[in-house]
């Protein structure tokens, strides 16, 4: 593939921007993965890797996870803050605390811990805190405890502090402080506390409710003052060491981040005036990733990079400190999405394709109803040279005629054959109009979008949207989707992707298309009998954890892929995926009991013994098989 062709494909799918140097198109037109851009010779052809795994028995769909991407993301964020601190003369430390709610899988947590980079862990529930405490011995032991807390949660955190870890119990509700003080006295431990301030600043987009005065979490200004006095009266004011705020999970606009940090810096200044020695400044999450590759302020993009993010935070905090003669606090970010999103790709196979094929239409019978004649006359007019009617008018006339035919069919005025002929002719007319439209003509763009959606191939993909990409369904989030091969060809077709659940919501509605978003996906020409595998990229944050069991489709298989500079690749199975039996047990349906009931039914039939045994074996094999569709 020429460099010009490769450049065009990169622009079509915006790979150069959302791929972030981890994903690229190689000379074969295949997706290439480079888990560590600092070691460019360590890369793997993803299409070839998947096919090799399939030959060894790998089932699809499957998650292909690249732990080296996790580690590179962590290094990159740490490096950005190091540069920012050096640039602005900032004397405080920086610490990334990974919020495990983003992806609690052991492979993720341990890959980050073993990266060799400074790392803390954040918990938002008792279960998460137990996981964090168990792993705390492997890292520098900074632990941040967020979320609602009962007595057991608080005791666990204090036990961690008693064991020598730095555990910051962030006060989110005033009711928590009394329990903290009681249990700290019982355990004879000095608590290490933080306060989450509820800012007036608020971001925009899908996660804007995390910030602002109506936020679910955090203390208002009056409550912050009340907390300070409560701790002062208890002789524990020195325990309040961390200031925390959180604007949202995916902040698209750097201006919103800068505004929030400046406001929170005022809290830092005012708390010091009250005698509170705040030592840590936790700006929470918000560091977004560019799912679209548009570098914009849209909900699924960001208009900044790591360096600009770090610069804005360090400058704003440092400036407030310099103005008021205060020490530079340690800065903490809880950048879970930015660390994990890129490292996982869901790969699946297309199990069926419904394509709109175009044939040369034949004239209707001479005595055909008027609506059929009208449709045919419009078709003929479209092919006459010098016609003065617009493309839009042709399209509108044909749509009205087809509508009349559908109405007439319902009342018996048209036969099934006549309806089929009309629909096929209308399809050909749409195709003819589509060929003559000019994307550069602003007036044509709505028609282009309408026809692309109408004419797109329907691709039925072996996956559950609800299990593997729940945010695409729940909040209409966009993820990069494209074939793993065939990217050396011009994307002349359009497609929509449908999952295998029995739910009309199981469809992807938005796709990357150059610098914009479309309702259909650009596709290179392909063999409908042997369609390409598809990759769903950047699903490493939240998707595995939020996935649900709609239609009892379970977790997919997952493999960890390690790529080395000599070209060698090491693959480890990290999750075997759920069986049908696993999913049935989740809903209190015992597989053994079901097998017994099925066996009883089979025995009551008049089938011969061999057939009965065959049916029983097939049922039992299905119970312990994959929940997704499998090739025979």
Curated annotation (Swiss-Prot):
EC number(s) given by UniProt: 4.1.1.19
Domain of life: Bacteria
PROSITE patterns: ODR_DC_2_1, ODR_DC_2_2
Catalytic activity annotation: L-arginine + H(+) = agmatine + CO2
GO BP field: arginine catabolic process; putrescine biosynthetic process from arginine; spermidine biosynthetic process
Needed cofactors: Mg(2+); pyridoxal 5'-phosphate
GO MF annotations in UniProt: arginine decarboxylase activity; metal ion binding
InterPro entries recorded: Ala_racemase/Decarboxylase_C, Arg_decarb_HB, Arg_decarbox_C, Arg_decrbxlase, De-COase2_CS, De-COase2_N, De-COase2_pyr-phos_BS, Orn/DAP/Arg_de-COase
Chain positions found as N6-(pyridoxal phosphate)lysine: 101
The protein's annotated pathway: Amine and polyamine biosynthesis; agmatine biosynthesis; agmatine from L-arginine: step 1/1
Binding site for substrate: 281-291
Pfam families reported for this sequence: Arg_decarb_HB, Arg_decarbox_C, Orn_Arg_deC_N
Enzyme class: lyase
Keyword terms, alphabetized: Decarboxylase, Lyase, Magnesium, Metal-binding, Polyamine biosynthesis, Putrescine biosynthesis, Pyridoxal phosphate, Spermidine biosynthesis
Role: Catalyzes the biosynthesis of agmatine from arginine.
Family of the protein in this entry: Belongs to the Orn/Lys/Arg decarboxylase class-II family. SpeA subfamily.
This protein's name: Biosynthetic arginine decarboxylase
Organism: Salmonella dublin (strain CT_02021853)
Gene: speA
């Amino acid at each position: 593939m020429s460099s010009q062709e490769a450049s065009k494909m990169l622009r079509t799918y915006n790979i150069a921007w959302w791929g972030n140097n981890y994903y690229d198109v190689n000379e074969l037109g295949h997706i290439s993965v480079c888990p560590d851009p600092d070691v460019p010779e360590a890369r793997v052809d993803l299409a070839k890797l998947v096919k090799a795994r399939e030959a060894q028995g790998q089932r699809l769909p499957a998650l292909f996870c690249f732990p080296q991407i996790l580690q590179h993301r962590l290094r990159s964020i740490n490096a950005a803050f190091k540069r920012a601190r050096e640039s602005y003369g900032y004397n405080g430390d920086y610490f990334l605390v990974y919020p495990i709610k983003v992806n609690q899988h052991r492979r993720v947590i341990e890959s980050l811990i073993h990266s060799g980079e400074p790392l803390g862990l954040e918990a938002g529930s008792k279960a998460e805190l137990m996981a964090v405490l168990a792993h705390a011995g492997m890292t520098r032991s900074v632990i941040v405890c967020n979320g609602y807390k009962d007595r057991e949660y608080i005791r666990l955190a204090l036990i961690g502090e008693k064991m020598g870890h730095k555990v910051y119990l962030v006060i989110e509700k005033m009711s928590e402080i009394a329990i903290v003080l009681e249990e700290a006295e019982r355990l004879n431990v000095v608590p290490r506390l933080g306060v989450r301030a509820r800012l007036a600043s608020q971001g925009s987009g899908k996660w804007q409710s995390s910030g602002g005065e109506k936020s679910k979490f955090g203390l208002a200004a009056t409550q912050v003052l009340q907390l300070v006095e409560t701790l002062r009266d208890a002789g524990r004011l020195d325990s309040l060491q961390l200031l925390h705020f959180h604007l949202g999970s995916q902040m698209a606009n750097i201006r919103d981040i800068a505004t929030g940090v400046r406001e929170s810096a005022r809290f830092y200044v005012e708390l010091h005036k009250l005698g509170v020695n705040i030592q840590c400044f936790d700006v929470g999450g918000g560091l977004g990733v560019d799912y679209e590759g548009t570098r914009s302020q849209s909900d699924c993009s960001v208009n900044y990079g790591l360096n600009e993010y770090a610069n804005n935070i360090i400058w704003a905090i440092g400036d407030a400190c310099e103005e008021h003669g205060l020490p530079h606090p340690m800065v903490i970010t809880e950048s879970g999405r930015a660390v994990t999103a890129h490292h996982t790709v869901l790969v699946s196979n297309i199990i069926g394709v419904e394509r709109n094929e175009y044939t040369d239409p034949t004239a209707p019978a001479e005595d055909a109803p008027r609506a059929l004649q009208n449709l045919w006359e419009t078709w003929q007019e479209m092919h006459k040279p010098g016609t003065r009617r617009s493309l839009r008018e042709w399209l509108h006339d044909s749509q009205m005629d087809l509508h009349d035919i559908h109405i007439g069919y319902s009342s018996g005025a048209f036969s099934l054959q006549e309806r089929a002929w009309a629909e096929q002719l209308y399809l050909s007319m749409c195709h003819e109009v589509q060929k003559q439209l000019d994307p550069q003509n602003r007036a044509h763009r709505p028609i282009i979008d309408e026809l692309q959606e109408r004419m797109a191939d329907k691709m039925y993909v072996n996956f559950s949207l609800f299990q593997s990409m729940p945010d695409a369904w729940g909040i209409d989030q966009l993820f990069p989707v494209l074939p793993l091969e065939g990217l050396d060809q011009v994307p002349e077709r359009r497609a929509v992707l449908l999952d295998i659940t029995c739910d009309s919501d199981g469809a992807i509605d938005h796709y990357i298309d150059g610098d914009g978003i479309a309702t259909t996906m650009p596709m290179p020409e392909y063999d409908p009998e042997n369609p390409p595998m598809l990759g769903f990229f950047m699903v490493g944050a939240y998707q595995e954890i939020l996935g649900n069991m709609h239609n009892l489709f379970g977790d997919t298989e997952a493999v960890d892929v390690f790529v080395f500079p000599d070209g060698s690749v090491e693959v480890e199975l990290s999750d075997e995926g759920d069986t049908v039996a696993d999913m049935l047990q989740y809903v209190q349906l015992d597989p053994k009991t079901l097998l017994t009931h099925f066996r009883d039914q089979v025995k009551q039939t008049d089938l011969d013994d061999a057939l009965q045994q065959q049916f029983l074996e097939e049922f039992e094999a299905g119970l312990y098989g994959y929940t997704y569709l499998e090739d025979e």
